[in-house]
């Protein structure tokens, strides 16, 4: 009696996992195609932000260098 229920349970598990796998295989490419443009926009914003920080640091170092060079005597 127990083996009959175990067999039915295993059949249901196999069927359920097959359906889930088919669902995931079908939906994941669509989700990737939907999410990819948003990730590119976020990455582009992040790159612009990092370029802006880099330029600010570069200007600050340039001003510090000018200040340092102005303290040296002229020869």
From Swiss-Prot:
GO terms for cellular component: extracellular region. Expressed by the venom gland. One of its GO terms (biological process) is regulation of defense response to virus. It is found in: Secreted. Residues 47-75 form a propeptide. The keyword Secreted applies. The modification Arginine amide is found at residue 43. The keyword Signal applies. Keywords: Amidation, Antimicrobial, Antiviral protein, Secreted, Signal. Residues 1-22 form the signal peptide. Transmembrane segments: none annotated. Its main location: secreted. It comes from the Eukaryota. Shows a low ability to inhibit hepatitis C virus (HCV) infection in Huh7.5.1 cells and no ability to inhibit hepatitis B virus in HepG2.2.15 cells. Belongs to the non-disulfide-bridged peptide (NDBP) superfamily. Short antimicrobial peptide (group 4) family. This is Peptide Ctri10033.
């Amino acid at each position: 009696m127990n083996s009959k229920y175990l067999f039915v349970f295993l059949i249901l598990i196999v069927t359920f996992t097959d359906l889930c796998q088919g669902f995931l295989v079908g939906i994941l490419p669509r989700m990737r195609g939907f999410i990819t443009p948003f990730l590119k926009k976020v990455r582009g914003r992040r790159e612009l932000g990092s370029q802006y920080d880099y330029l600010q640091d570069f200007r600050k170092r340039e001003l510090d260098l000018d200040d340092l060079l102005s303290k040296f005597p002229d020869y």
